[in-house]
């Protein structure tokens, strides 16, 4: 085995780190890097005075060697017994694996190691490493420990620039395939700036990028009590002053820093109050002793006689430190295991024998029990609930864990977990408001709801830890990690330029190549941008930084105040807009996806909308999704976000034509270094020089052609109002709430102006109608928890033109309601029956109203909210009393008025239908005549006279002798007087004698008949 002298600077760096309690970072380039881990660990073991440092070994899938420790130990013991162990010849790596406490961990299971501490961390499979994983693992290493990153053999570190990372496959979409590895480039360049970082090859030769260690010198040995800081002296004084106050004194004695001691005192103050209504929130960066402070506080709660103590965290594995300090507290309080308490460990192999229960039976039965964050229902008898790593628990679960008991919570706020800001921004903000409300006296506005709110109000105490315990202050690796991942941008700079008018501000395009080049000026600008991101958004993880730098479809814009021409410094940033270009998916891909139910990564809006509406054409449109609009916290709500959005829309509508003749071409691929050009040991890595300007005006860059702008966000009333005001229309609302925030994802779209604008807007109007119909149906299911105000805000949208719907007809009415139903409604409208009698009809009425099928029926906002709450969300009047904030009597009055209006409308519909069925009366159209009345009468008289003459002429030609009535008046008078009143027949003597010829008989009979008839007529006249 060839032996080689190790560079002395490596040993000095490790020993200095141990002496200063600061971590060191080693990047080992080469396939045999794992063999050098043994040497580095050996140096660390010699430098530290305590036991062999434990190791955390993280990998993707394949470890590359057997991790079976027992098997290796048996083999080793056999060799020792047989005397065949040769330390010079045997593989030192085998010995290292057998004799060291190594925790092997897949990258996708690193959440289980939160809260644990290791002496050394090894990260292999660099391509699987993400910023989140880097932050999570590096922060578990204690002061004096080592972080070792293993890279494969390469000729140049610049090969890492073009290395394909596993996460890149998620950034590629059908339309955007070319990923540029800006994050890796910045990562490598940042290594040169870290004073405690060494980049070495697998022969332990130091590479030129780490030239800063050329002058490293060993630190002189220091006495332990030398140079105590003022904080350490204050801590000693505090411990001495509390010696006589027990059990507080012994617990504070276990604290390492002044911050931690003050936190423990605050916890014990909450315990001793025993109001069970206060929340103590402890926030700090990693490695500040949060879990230890909680553990000591739990020991204090047991000493104060608390019986039911529950502890929760994402996994029992995260509670190693907490329980370790519970037992340290017990030792200080002179509790003895088995005599005073017993420990129950988990048998679940996933939890790695974690402590899940402690039974204390010194004075009376007391328990400390681990529960899963989702099991808040089991907290019925709790007196104290402790939430560790609250930042890693979804926000809705943390809210459900708060109740009528004392709550201690600890949270990491550096944003490494992704939800750290969520907890500090949202939850603690809400607790602050509740706490403030409890101080205010009740008003007479609505005493019932105010009293209920005050009953649940809690007092909030906030504690933060600044001083690090896991490693000494000023740790170089912590500073490097914070700068690399922009974790430490919580302190946002105040803008000194005043409030410019939003109309005067301009939007600029940010060149990402320049932004992530690790130049000093661009680093300052990047930190400013990320500070805005962190301060104005609920969820911000380091992975977002990698997506921003590497994803090909993402673009950055920033809103800047008017910049005077003489200004040399970088301007203040008012707002940042991140846009992701989506769409342009081939129809075939969408059809395949719809038929198989599979979606590719990326293209969030096209895939979701295509699936929701089963529309294969939508994915072909090109759109821009606004990923974030982050506005400076001092300027929120002043119109800067709306201005940025307005300018962005104008840019993509082509209203800023590109005036540049030669557009700045950014090289798509990075120049690779040939292996002959320079060796790894001679290569000098520096930031690139030939970079385009950081900021471009919108008319200096041609815009991509887009059909629509879209946004997907967690639905809140404020955000909905903002996007509606910007002209966006909701088309999708996810039915299940987001695990992290408890909010429902909402997708809203807006078409961009084009020549055929009417046709453009038609598909959006169709989507909106379909969405509204579905949303109304789902209001009684997943969306029943929404407040009526929020639901109304979603349904009412003026950004889509109202289409004229057919009025409600009698057939439709009869299909929905029986005559008896209408009778019931009428009876209620007259206050003759109770409202329970018509509750079954309200859903149908609500649906008709909100689908605009009730014609001109108009309701006030309160009436609409009431109708929606009762009819579509199926809420009780008591619930609505709290949500609408009106007394129930007033609500019932409003409800009766709604039904009256509806009954009147239904009656009108029926009356109209009956009118249409009745016989139609002919309408006489009165028009002025052409002739005067006298002319008209003269003409009619002439016509009559002519007609009369013709008829008289006809009569003259006919023989009328047979119709002549014989006799004169005297004869008739005589005959009639003789006959009397009741006579039916009278006879008059004729002058002619009757002819007796047989031939004339028929004629005679006819004549007689006629005569008889004539006589009858005469008789009738007489009667009259």
Curated annotation (Swiss-Prot):
Q: EC number(s) for this protein?
A: 2.3.1.-
In the record, Phosphoserine modifications are located at 934, 984, 987
Q: Where is it localised?
A: Nucleus, Nucleolus
Describe the outcome of a gene knockout: Embryonic lethality before 14.5 dpc. Heterozygous mice are healthy and show enhanced healthspan in a Hutchinson-Gilford progeria syndrome (HGPS) mouse model; molecular mechanisms explaining the relation between Nat10 activity and nuclear architecture defects in HGPS mouse models are however unclear.
Q: Where is the composition biased (Basic residues)?
A: 1005-1024
Its Gene Ontology biological processes? negative regulation of telomere maintenance via telomerase; positive regulation of translation; protein acetylation; regulation of centrosome duplication; ribosomal small subunit biogenesis; rRNA acetylation involved in maturation of SSU-rRNA; tRNA acetylation
Identify the residues that the record assigns to the N-acetyltransferase domain, covering every copy.
Answer: 558-753
Q: What class of enzyme is it?
A: transferase
Does the UniProt entry include the keyword Acyltransferase? yes
Q: Where is this region: Disordered?
A: 990-1024
A GO MF label: mRNA N-acetyltransferase activity
Region described as Required for localization to the nucleolus and midbody: 702-1024
Question: What residues bind acetyl-CoA, as annotated?
Answer: 629-631, 636-642, 725
Database matches in PROSITE patterns: GNAT
Q: Which residues form a coiled coil?
A: none
SUPFAM superfamilies, per the entry: Acyl-CoA N-acyltransferases (Nat)
Question: What stretches pass through the bilayer?
Answer: none
Binding residues for ATP, per the UniProt record? 287-296, 470
Q: Which InterPro entries match?
A: Acyl_CoA_acyltransferase, GNAT_dom, NAT10, NAT10/TcmA_helicase, P-loop_NTPase, TmcA/NAT10/Kre33, TmcA_N, tRNA_bind_dom
Q: Which residues carry this modification: N6-acetyllysine?
A: 426
Query: Its family?
Result: Belongs to the RNA cytidine acetyltransferase family. NAT10 subfamily.
HAMAP family membership? RNA_acetyltr_Nat10
Entry-linked PANTHER family: N-ACETYLTRANSFERASE 10 (PTHR10925), RNA CYTIDINE ACETYLTRANSFERASE (PTHR10925:SF5)
Instruction: Cite the record's note on assembly.
Output: Part of the small subunit (SSU) processome, composed of more than 70 proteins and the RNA chaperone small nucleolar RNA (snoRNA) U3. Interacts with THUMPD1. Interacts with SUN1 (via N-terminus). Interacts with TERT.
UniProt name for this protein: RNA cytidine acetyltransferase
Gene name tied to this protein: Nat10
């Amino acid at each position: 085995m060839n032996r080689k002298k190790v560079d002395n600077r490596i040993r000095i760096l490790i020993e200095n780190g141990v002496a200063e309690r600061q971590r060191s970072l080693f990047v080992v380039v080469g396939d045999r890097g794992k063999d050098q881990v043994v040497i580095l660990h050996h140096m660390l073991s010699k430098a530290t005075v305590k036991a062999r440092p434990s190791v955390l070994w993280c990998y993707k899938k394949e470890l590359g060697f057997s991790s079976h420790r027992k098997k290796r130990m048996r083999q080793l013991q056999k060799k020792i017994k047989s005397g065949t162990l040769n330390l010079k010849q045997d593989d030192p790596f085998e010995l290292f694996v057998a004799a060291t406490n190594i925790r092997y961990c897949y990258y996708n299971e690193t959440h289980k190691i939160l809260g644990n501490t290791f002496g050394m961390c090894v990260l292999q499979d660099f391509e699987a490493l993400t910023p989140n994983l880097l932050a999570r693992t590096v922060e578990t290493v204690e002061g004096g420990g080592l972080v070792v990153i293993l890279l494969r053999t390469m000729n140049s570190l610049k090969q890492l620039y073009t290395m394909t990372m596993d996460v890149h496959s998620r950034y590629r979409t059908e339309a955007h395939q070319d990923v540029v590895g800006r994050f890796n480039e910045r990562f490598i360049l940042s290594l040169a700036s870290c004073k405690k970082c060494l980049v070495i090859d697998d022969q332990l030769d130091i590479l030129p990028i780490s030239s800063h260690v050329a002058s490293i010198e060993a630190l002189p040995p220091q006495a332990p009590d030398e140079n105590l800081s003022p904080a350490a002296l204050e801590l000693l004084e505090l411990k001495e002053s509390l010696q006589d106050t027990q059990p507080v004194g012994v617990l504070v004695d276990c604290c390492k820093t002044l911050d931690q001691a003050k936190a423990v005192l605050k916890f014990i103050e909450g315990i001793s109050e025993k109001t069970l209504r206060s929340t103590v929130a402890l926030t700090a960066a990693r490695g500040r002793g949060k879990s230890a402070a909680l553990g000591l506080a739990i020991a204090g709660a047991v000493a104060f006689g608390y019986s039911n103590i529950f502890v929760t965290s994402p996994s029992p594995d995260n509670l190693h430190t907490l329980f370790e300090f519970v037992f340290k507290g017990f030792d200080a309080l002179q509790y003895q295991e088995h005599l005073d308490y017993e420990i129950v460990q988990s048998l679940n192999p996933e939890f790695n024998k974690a402590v899940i229960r402690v039974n204390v039976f010194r004075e009376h039965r007391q328990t400390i029990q681990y529960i899963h964050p989702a099991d808040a229902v089991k907290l019925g008898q709790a007196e104290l609930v402790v939430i560790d790593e609250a930042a890693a628990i979804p926000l809705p679960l943390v809210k459900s864990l708060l109740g009528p008991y004392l709550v201690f919570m600890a949270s990491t706020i550096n944003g490494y977990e992704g939800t750290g800001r969520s907890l500090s921004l949202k939850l603690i903000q809400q607790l602050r408001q509740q706490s403030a409300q409890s101080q205010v006296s009740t008003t007479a506005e609505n005493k019932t709801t105010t009293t209920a709110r005050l009953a649940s109000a809690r007092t909030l105490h906030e504690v933060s830890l600044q001083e690090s315990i896991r490693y000494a202050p000023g740790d170089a690796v912590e500073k490097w990690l914070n700068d690399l991942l922009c974790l430490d941008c919580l302190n946002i700079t105040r803008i000194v330029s005043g409030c410019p008018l939003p109309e005067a501000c301009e939007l600029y395009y940010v060149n990402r190549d320049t932004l992530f080049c690790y130049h000093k000026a661009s680093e300052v600008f990047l930190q400013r941008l990320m500070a805005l991101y962190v301060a104005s958004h609920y969820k911000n993880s380091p992975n977002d930084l990698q997506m921003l730098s590497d994803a090909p479809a993402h673009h950055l814009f920033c809103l800047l105040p008017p910049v005077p021409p003489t200004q040399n410094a970088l301007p203040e940033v008012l707002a940042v807009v991140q846009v992701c270009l989506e769409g342009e998916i081939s129809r075939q891909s969408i059809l395949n996806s719809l038929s198989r139910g599979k979606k590719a990564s990326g293209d969030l809006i096209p895939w979701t909308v295509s699936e929701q509406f089963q529309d294969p054409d939508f994915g072909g449109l090109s759109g821009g999704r606004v990923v974030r609009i982050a506005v400076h916290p001092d300027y929120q709500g002043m119109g800067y976000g709306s201005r940025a959005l307005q300018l962005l829309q104008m840019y993509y509508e082509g209203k800023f034509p590109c005036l540049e003749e030669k557009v700045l071409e950014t090289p798509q691929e990075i120049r690779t270094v040939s292996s002959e050009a320079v060796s790894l040991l001679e290569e000098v890595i520096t930031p690139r020089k030939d970079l385009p300007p950081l900021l471009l005006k919108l008319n200096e860059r041609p815009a991509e052609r887009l059909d629509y702008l879209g946004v997907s966000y967690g639905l809140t009333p404020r955000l909905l109002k903002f996007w509606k005001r910007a002209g966006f229309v909701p088309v999708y609302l996810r039915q299940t709430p987001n695990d992290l925030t408890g909010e429902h994802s909402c997708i809203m779209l807006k078409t961009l102006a084009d020549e055929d604008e009417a046709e453009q807007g038609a598909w959006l109007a169709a989507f909106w109608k379909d969405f509204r119909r579905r949303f109304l149906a789902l209001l009684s299911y997943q969306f029943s928890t929404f407040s009526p105000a929020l639901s109304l805000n979603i349904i009412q949208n003026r950004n889509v033109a109202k289409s004229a719907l057919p009025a409600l007809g009698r057939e439709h009415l009869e299909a929905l309601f029986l005559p008896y139903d209408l009778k019931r409604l009428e009876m209620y409208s007259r206050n003759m029956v109770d409202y329970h009698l018509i509750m079954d009809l309200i859903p149908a009425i609500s649906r008709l109203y909100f689908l605009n099928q009730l014609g001109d029926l108009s309701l006030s906002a309160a009436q609409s909210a009431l109708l929606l709450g009762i009819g579509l969300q199926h809420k009780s009047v008591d619930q609505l009393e709290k949500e609408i904030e009106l007394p129930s009597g007033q609500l019932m009055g409003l409800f009766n008025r709604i039904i009256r209006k509806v009954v009147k409308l239904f009656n009108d519909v029926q009356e109209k239908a009956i009118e249409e069925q009745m016989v139609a009366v002919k309408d006489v159209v009165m028009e002025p005549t052409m002739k005067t009345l006298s002319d008209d009468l003269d003409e009619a008289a002439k016509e009559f006279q002519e007609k009369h003459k013709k008829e008289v002429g006809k009569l003259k030609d006919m023989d009328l002798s047979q119709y002549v009535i014989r006799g004169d008046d005297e004869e008739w008078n005589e005959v009639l007087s003789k006959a009397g009143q009741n006579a039916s027949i009278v006879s008059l003597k004729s002058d002619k004698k009757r002819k007796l010829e047989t031939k004339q008989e028929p004629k005679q009979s006819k004549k007689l008949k006629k005569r008889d008839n004539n006589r009858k007529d005469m008789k009738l006249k007489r009667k009259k």
